[in-house]
Amino acid sequence: MRSTNTRSARSRPTKRSVNASATPTQSFHRVDAHLSLLEGAEETGWVEFKTNTRVERIEQDADSVTVYDQNGNAYRGVALIGADGVRSVVRQTYVNDQPRVTGHVVYRAVVDKDEFPQDLRWNASSLWVGPKCHLVHYPLRGGEQYNIVVTFQSRQQEEWGVTEGSKEEVESYFQDICPKARQLIGLPKSWKRWATADREPIPQWTFGRTTLLGDAAHPTTQYMAQGACMALEDAVTLGEALRVHGNDWGKALDLYQRSRITRTARIVLSGREMGRLYHAQGVERLVRNSLWKGRTTEQFYDAIQWLYGWNVDNCLSESI
């Protein structure tokens, strides 16, 4: 971790595992993860994809759930897993709350290795922090590409969504940072812009034979870098709950919910605090740097054991 005036505040050996049985930290391209999941779903022979389809209405009884799309088509099943994102129709049906727009904007771009500065080709996730902004970069696909992610606190009113980014806008927020970090801002030929949002954690997301998963259940800011990870954990936990309870969907969905609510709520709330720490200024910045510098490597790993110590063998433990 470096400040945007080039002074290093703290570094950690991310290749080292959190505990003796854990695997080292790895980063990969999200598209590659999507393709692996798609291939796995197709290989089962049980999955039928309906694209360009929006759920408009949900009905359920004691034995089944039926969803109706925008064209009036009905789809009936034994359960409904709402994994339909931040603006979840399934969540809106049963919870009826609204996303909390943070005012923090994220710009993302991927750059080929040959275009990335030689002196910044570190085989690690690297974080530059500054007042009301931060910048992250890390290698993808064995170092053949680098992901650049910059975040700033917007000067304007934001609405949640993803749009094409403006090079002029992102440069205007990072014009005063040190040259070594600022050179990264000019590399991408195009940017994607996210106006971020989360939601308040809720104590229930299973309703009869319907439940929520991923961003539909617990949308979070990017500061813990756990949005996609939590969705994958949800899926694994749901699978384990079904293994325990067989075809009893009521018990399985209840076990799944009880296993996930506390952990995912902690991610959402921790993300908000990490955003404050990353963007600290003035005396608060000095306190942050002092706290991070004062931790030993062992203390650092102890502090994140709760996050990275999760695995399939303990995923149901919080509910028991």
From Swiss-Prot:
Pfam families: FAD_binding_3
Transmembrane segments: none
The keyword Flavoprotein is assigned to this record: yes
Signal peptide residues on this chain, from the entry's feature table: none
One GO term of the biological process aspect: catabolic process
Reaction(s) the record says it catalyses: 3-hydroxybenzoate + NADH + O2 + H(+) = 2,5-dihydroxybenzoate + NAD(+) + H2O
Entry's EC annotation: 1.14.13.24
Induction: By 3-hydroxybenzoate.
UniProt-annotated stretches for the region Disordered: 1-25
Polar residues: bias regions: 16-25
GO MF, one example: 3-hydroxybenzoate 6-monooxygenase activity
InterPro entries listed in its UniProt record: FAD-bd, FAD-dep_Monooxygenase_BioMet, FAD/NAD-bd_sf
Cofactor: FAD
Keywords: Aromatic hydrocarbons catabolism, FAD, Flavoprotein, Monooxygenase, NAD, Oxidoreductase
Domain of life: Bacteria
Functional description taken from the UniProt entry: Catalyzes the conversion of 3-hydroxybenzoate to gentisate.
PANTHER family, sorted: GERANYLGERANYL DIPHOSPHATE REDUCTASE (PTHR13789:SF318), MONOOXYGENASE (PTHR13789)
Family: Belongs to the 3-hydroxybenzoate 6-hydroxylase family.
Full protein name: 3-hydroxybenzoate 6-hydroxylase 2
Organism: Aquipseudomonas alcaligenes (Pseudomonas alcaligenes)
Gene: hbzD
